[in-house]
């Protein structure tokens, strides 16, 4: 059986890693051994941050809703309690968008929440 030399396979593997590391600084984009570590680490960061993004957006939405609610004389927690009592099911993403872009509509929702709390 003929001996298989690994040149083609190794070259392909190196090119793949170096392509993924394109745009990295210095040796991280040029040296295979360093680039491989950088690509692995980047993948770990990407995996972690896909999960963190969901938490960060929820926190941002809550901060925006809280700011809008306080302008209308209610705290975030009281607003959410009022919405639950009034059986208004609007998610935080939409509420935050209303608080920022549609202040009148948000104020109307806050008033309904206030009425259900009274």
UniProtKB/Swiss-Prot annotation:
GO cellular component annotations of the record: ribonucleoprotein complex; ribosome
Origin superkingdom: Bacteria
An example molecular function term from Gene Ontology annotations: rRNA binding
InterPro entries: Ribosomal_bL20, RIBOSOMAL_L20_CS, Ribosomal_protein_bL20_C
Keywords: Ribonucleoprotein, Ribosomal protein, RNA-binding, rRNA-binding
Keyword Amino-acid biosynthesis belongs to the record: no
Tagged with keyword Coiled coil: no
One annotated GO biological process: ribosomal large subunit assembly
Function: Binds directly to 23S ribosomal RNA and is necessary for the in vitro assembly process of the 50S ribosomal subunit. It is not involved in the protein synthesizing functions of that subunit.
Annotated family: Belongs to the bacterial ribosomal protein bL20 family.
Protein name, as recorded: Large ribosomal subunit protein bL20
Species lineage: Bacteria, Pseudomonadati, Pseudomonadota, Gammaproteobacteria, Pseudomonadales
């Amino acid at each position: 059986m003929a001996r298989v030399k690994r040149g083609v396979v190794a070259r392909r593997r190196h090119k793949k890693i170096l392509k993924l590391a394109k745009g990295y600084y210095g040796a991280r984009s040029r040296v295979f051994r360093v680039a491989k570590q950088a690509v692995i680490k980047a993948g770990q960061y990407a995996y972690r941050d896909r999960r963190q993004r969901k938490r960060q957006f929820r926190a941002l939405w809550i901060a925006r809703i809280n700011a809008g609610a306080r302008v209308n004389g209610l705290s975030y927690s009281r607003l959410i309690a009022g919405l639950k009592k009034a059986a208004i099911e609007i998610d935080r993403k939409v509420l935050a968008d209303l608080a920022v872009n549609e202040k009148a509509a948000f104020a109307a929702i806050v008033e309904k929440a206030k009425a259900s709390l009274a």
